[in-house]
Regions:
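Periplasmic/cell-envelope proteins involved in peptidoglycan metabolism and beta-lactam response
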Residues: 1-264, 280, 352-366, 375, ...
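Beta-lactam-recognizing serine transpeptidase/beta-lactamase-like catalytic domain environment
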Residues: 69, 189-201, 214, 240-285, ...
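Residue-level marker for well-ordered alpha-helical positions
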Residues: 124, 224, 289-292, 354, ...
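Short loop/edge segments at beta-strand edges and connector loops
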Residues: 142, 481, 653
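A generic alpha-helix signature
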Residues: 217-221, 447, 451, 455, ...
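Residues within well-formed alpha-helices
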Residues: 221, 290-294, 334, 410, ...
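Ligand-recognition elements built from short beta-strands and adjacent flexible loops
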Residues: 476, 541-661
Length: 661
């Protein structure tokens, strides 16, 4: 036994060693085969620091290349929890500079396992204060801030972005996948003692630029006149849409109340709503143009046919409908000019429900237009089988149907261009490193024939010369149009309100070679609520300024004493609008870039904005940093303030500098 004892001991040792080595090998095999990814990731986490580089969003331009939305690189502050030895002290010091609770900052640092962002997009002054503290583990990385240099101008169309640079409205949202770009990455390598020894960077790809069909100068004119009438009429909301009838391009889309996308959080969802595409309304008498189009094209009437308007009332399937005033015998031309409901209904009854329904569909009613803006409303046109016996009477005068401003302006443009319904468009081009295809668009279609369109333009000219649209008459240009005054549905009763209206005016100018179509809509104006009284003067002021800016030749003699217009004695004649606007673009670009460079030498942009001055000249101050309403109150109403053309830029530059902060 004593001789076998050493052997046994060696055997035991050998067995234990084999088992131990087997266990080690098994464990190593397990870790290698089943836990490799987990431990490799942990090692990378200890050795690497990865930061995402936010891409530069693409610039949004107007049709002439003027910048409407830009991005500016700014510093964000980060803290590395490994290098911050005293989170409490660091948080206390940073809280003073960042104006954030120290407890919140300390919690962020203590709970982080990798570098954590403490605050985004700081002003240069704040960055300098923090940099002077020389805090170990605190560093800066560049991130981009979206800036809208014109503030309220075109805000509803442009939209806005959230704190993470994601498009949240308008073009920013609709074309976000093109505009936002692709993030980059920065990877920093560290050794076992947390000493950084290598840095690798994958650059961010900037987003594509977007060129809109909007003309910034025309947009300014539209917003200026819209805001002025909103102030005078105390309407709830207002919309102006201006279109090129030859191709469907939208030249201006203005909505009130306005909002500033640089500070979008201050405004309600209603304020940020683009009513031109999302808010459907009953059009009232502007819809009579479509009723007439169907009847004229089918040959059931002609402009000179006489209609008995029955002294102002008609019974349709048991429903009594009253005119706004009693009429006797009127020609079809005068039925439209005087906006007789009874006469229009009788014409629709001759046309018949099936053909009338087809006409409305031909003009795009009840259908999406496909305009490149989010949240488009198709409006309401019930299928023919769902009509009641009295529906044709209601539809003929723009009731029991709802439309968006973009739908109506497109229908009016079809009359203007000879009968072709072009899908409205607001995106002209997407600019990238390689050619980028535009989102799919609908095809133009024939809404009516050219003869009917020409007849309707002549009838609509009578509305302006002799009918309900006299206040829309232009100086030096022919104009055709149609007013609309539609009762609103009272949500409490489900019936038409006796004192709440949509007042609108849709117009074409000039008549024979139309350059623009313009739609003006006001929701619940106080006092004068008829479309011709409220919308007509706005059409007149906008059309005269826009046609002059576009260098459209006069097609009728101008009247003497043209320094002021008849509907707004304080409003100047814009004969030199084009030259002044072009001069403004050059001057304001240099001024705006100087203001940006003062805060951030890497960022450049332009902010041309036009304001109309006194008499027959157009004066152009730098209005960046001011609201449209502020411009109106301080410049437009009082002609005597011509000195605004040479106003100091101090306030404007200070406003933009404050924006960067």
């Amino acid at each position: 036994m004593e001789q076998r004892s050493p052997r046994l001991r060696w055997l035991v040792v050998w067995v234990v060693a084999v088992v131990w080595m087997g266990a080690v090998l098994a464990r190593l095999s397990y870790l290698q085969l089943f836990c490799y990814s987990e431990y490799f990731a942990k090692a990378q986490h200890q050795q690497q620091r990865v930061f995402e580089i936010s891409p530069m969003r693409g610039v949004i331009y107007d049709r002439k290349g003027r910048e409407l939305a830009i991005s500016i690189p700014m510093d964000s502050v980060f803290a590395d929890p490994v290098d911050v030895k005293d989170p409490e002290m660091v948080a206390r010091l940073l809280s003073r500079a960042l104006n954030l609770p120290a407890e919140e900052l300390e919690t962020k640092i203590r709970e982080a396992s990798k570098p954590v962002r403490l605050a985004k997009k700081l002003s240069p002054e704040t960055v300098e204060r923090i940099d002077d503290m020389n805090l170990k583990g605190v560093f800066f990385e560049k991130e981009n801030r979206r800036v809208y240099p014109q503030h309220e101008l075109l805000a509803h169309v442009l939209g806005w972005v959230d704190v993470d640079e994601k498009g949240m409205g308008g073009i920013e949202h609709e074309l976000d996948k093109w505009i936002r770009g692709r993030p980059g990455r920065v990877m920093v390598m560290a050794d076992g003692k947390r000493r950084f020894y290598d840095r690798r960077e994958a650059a961010a790809d900037p987003g594509a630029g977007v060129v809109l069909t909007i003309d910034e100068t025309i947009q300014y004119i539209a917003e200026k006149e819209l805001a002025l009438t909103m102030q005078q009429s105390h309407a709830h909301t207002g919309t102006v849409v201006i279109q090129d009838p030859s191709n469907g391009a939208l030249l201006a889309v203005a909505t009130a109340p306005a909002f500033d996308p640089n500070d979008y959080g201050k405004y309600s969802d209603d304020d940020r709503m683009d009513r031109a595409v999302t808010a459907a309304y009953e059009p009232g008498s502007t819809f009579k143009i479509i009723t007439m189009a169907g009847a004229l094209e089918d040959g059931v009437t002609n402009p000179d046919e006489l209609v008995d308007c029955q002294e102002g009332s008609i019974l349709v399937a048991g429903r009594l409908i009253h005119d706004h005033k009693p009429f006797g015998i009127l020609s079809v031309r005068d039925v439209l000019a005087q906006s007789s409901d009874v006469g229009t209904i009788k014409i629709a009854l001759k046309l018949g429900a099936p053909r009338f329904y087809d006409t409305m569909r031909d003009f795009g009613i009840g259908q999406l237009t496909g305009v490149e803006l989010p949240g488009e409303n198709r409006g309401l046109l019930r299928p023919l089988e769902n009509w009641t016996p009295s529906s044709i009477g209601s539809l003929a005068i723009g009731q029991e149907v709802s439309v968006t401003p973009v739908q109506i302006i497109s229908a009016i443009s079809a009359i203007a261009n000879g009968g072709t319904l072009y899908p409205p468009r607001i995106v002209q081009e997407i600019r990238g490193g390689t050619p980028i295809a535009l989102p799919p668009r609908g095809e133009p279609k024939q809404a009516t024939d050219s003869k009917t369109a020409a007849t309707l333009r002549e009838m609509m000219e009578s509305v302006v010369l002799e009918g309900t649209g006299k206040k829309a008459k232009l100086n030096g240009y022919t104009a055709a149009g149609k007013s609309g005054t539609a009762q609103k549905i009272d949500p409490n009763t489900g019936r038409y309100s006796p004192n709440q209206y949509f007042a609108s005016f849709a117009g074409i100018a000039p008549v024979n070679e139309p350059a623009v179509t313009i739609l003006v809509v006001f929701d619940s104006p106080v006092g004068q609520h008829f479309g011709g009284d409220t919308g007509g003067p706005v059409f007149e002021r906008i059309a005269e300024q826009v046609l002059a800016y576009l260098d459209v030749a006069h097609d009728v003699p101008t009247q003497p004493n043209t320094q002021t217009t008849k509907n707004n004695p304080g409003q100047p004649n814009p004969n030199n609008a084009r030259a002044a606007a072009e001069t403004a673009n050059t001057e304001n670009e240099a001024r705006f870039q100087a203001a940006v460079a003062q805060k951030n030498p890497d960022a450049q942009s332009s902010a041309p904005t036009v304001a109309f001055g006194e008499e027959d000249a157009v004066t152009v101050p730098d209005m960046s940093g001011q609201t449209v309403r502020g411009v109106i109150e301080g410049v437009v109403i009082d002609q005597a303030k011509a000195a605004v053309a040479s106003a100091s830029l101090t306030e404007s530059d200070a406003s933009f500098a404050a924006l960067l902060c």
